[in-house]
Amino acid sequence: PEMSRGLGDVYKRQEGRLVMASADIGIDLGTASILVYVKGKGVVLKEPSVVAYDRDTNKIVAIGEEARLMLGRTPGNIVAIRPLRQGVISDYTITEKMLKYFIQKAVGRSYFGRRPRISVCVPSQVTEVEKKAVEDATYAAGARDVSIIEEPVAAAIGAGIDIYRPCGNMIVDIGGGTADIAVISLGGPVVSASIKVAGDDFDEAVVRFMRKKHNLLIGERTAEEIKIKIGTCLSLIHISEPTRHLRIS
């Protein structure tokens, strides 16, 4: 019910479509990457959820893509981390600074004079404490109002599905930290589950395989690149024309 009330404040019907109403900014605060949607402009920013900082001075060195390139390649005093784990905040202070940076980058420095309304999506079945942490971090980053939306609902709206119709729509949203599954009807999830197995676990599996099979130690960034390159199954499918037999290499 709380989530549905939040949706009512954020979205409205316009010519049979669901559109963002009162929120100025929509944020997909993902474990692996963050997307920022600005009303009237669409998705204006997509960058990795990575922050590099100097642990001697606690000063932020880089955020986003620049920080991702530092993963596994920094001197001892520079640490590149992901401040979110399995879809929830693991480092509140770093997440707050990261959010502030991305909001400012997406809409410009002038947003401090007109604080935006922001909707943020979170995994299904997160606790109230975890939701509150996201809400507080977003307010601290400069939001005037914050609405929390579950990721499958946000994915359904993004796909153009009318979530208020009296029919079931099954949504599977595989992210970096969680895989969220929900059946949505009449404005909200009827049943949902959040599995803490997703893209980051695939990366770790690649690292373990390379170490076990080839006695080769690779880093997180290389593992992600391998995952992306081998992640498309289309090139691995062969169809025999006479028999229509499907063979997967």
For each predicted feature, which ranges?
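Glycine-rich phosphate/oxyanion-binding loops and their immediately adjacent helices
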Residues: 4-11
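Nucleotide/phosphate-binding catalytic cleft detector across ATP-hydrolyzing
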Residues: 12-174, 182-240, 247
